[in-house]
Amino acid sequence: GYIWHTTGSGKTLTSFKAAQLATQLDSIDKVFFVVDRKDLDYQTMKEYQRFSPDSVNGSNNTDGLKDNLSKDDNKIIVTTIQKLNNLIKDEKALAVYNQQVVFIFDECHRSQFGEAQKNITKRFKRYYQFGFTGTPIFPQNASGAETTASVFGRELHAYTIANALNDEKVLKFKVDYNNVRPKFNYIETEQDATKLIAAETKKTLLHPTRIHAISEYILANFNQKTHRLYGRTSGFNAMFAVSNIEAAKLYYEKLNQVQVDHDKKLKIATIFSFNPNESQDGNIPDEGFEVTAMTSTAKEFLSKAIGDYNDFFKTNFSVDNKGFQNYYRDLAKRVKSQEVDLLIVVGMFLTGFDAPTLNTLFVDKNLRYHGIIQAYSRTNRIWTK
């Protein structure tokens, strides 16, 4: 079954206690906590270690995961869905396949879990599986894919965003719509995709005049939106969600260009990675840490943006896979500590990232259904400074 607990309601702690209690059952041999990406893997490990030091086993690769499975302990095994999938495909006869195991999936709305679940049923003989999600996939927002219930079974418990708002665990969303330039309104409000040629749509949305106008709007309104009217040391920071890598590049360059003469410049950073299927349906794309598949143009821009970051913070990150992972982790810390004012993203950080200092999300991107809730929920944490 699955547990529907809204983002910001303490889902990580609930899932940890569920995993911890499962390890204490005599009938259970192994407990897996499965996340979608290495960033969530790292965050979960840190969170679990905070709750209970030495309670979990993590791994850097499939071989490490295999080693952890051979250990005779009752620690929770934290792994990514990718590592688990690779292990199942490569290893045909592991002892764990015949053991009694529990799988707890975090953010189980993600598309990859459907494939993984099928592979698990092929290999594991005795298992229980539970999914945690803040945004379940229902038939009306499945976009032709499987629903959360079709993969995990029935809903076991629900604590929705309405419950969290009533209990004052999260903040309400305040949404402001801004028409930047009237000449572009028709393209921004057109709902019938058949009336638009994709190339023309992209060309219009990335038009230099539009990019410039939106960049000026963000810079002009940043202090008011983030409550920094009385100085940069107070208030919050912001995220800017854009449609694709090309948009991230254009906005990064234009924002820095427009503020070049400002006395107090925003510290702007960006992060993205390769996503083979650019989302047009309002879902947030699942970006991994693989940068090798990027186009040379995208990689060149990312390298420059990381270089700017290195210059500002006296760091030494790069676009190779390990350097990129370290950049991600350092960037996450600096966003949480408000050392970064504005973070431009395509898909990364829009799900599973918890930063109470973040109160504003600028959006120039198609978001629908659970994609909206996931993205907006980056801003509704309660922060007691």
Located regions from the model:
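Signature of the SF2 helicase/ATPase Hel1-core->accessory helical subdomain module
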Residues: 85-92, 96-199, 212, 350-385
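Walker A/P-loop
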Residues: 1-18
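Conserved SF1/SF2 helicase motif Ia
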Residues: 14-40
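Short basic/glycine-enriched coil/helix segment immediately N-terminal to the Walker B
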Residues: 70-73, 88-101, 323-328, 332-340, ...
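Conserved helix-turn-beta segment of the N-terminal RecA-like "Helicase ATP-binding" lobe
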Residues: 23-24, 38-63, 257-263
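Conserved C-terminal RecA-like helicase domain
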Residues: 202-342
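Inter-Walker segment of RecA-like/P-loop motor cores
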Residues: 49-89
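Conserved RecA-like ASCE P-loop NTPase motor core of nucleic-acid helicases/translocases
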Residues: 4, 29-37, 234-244
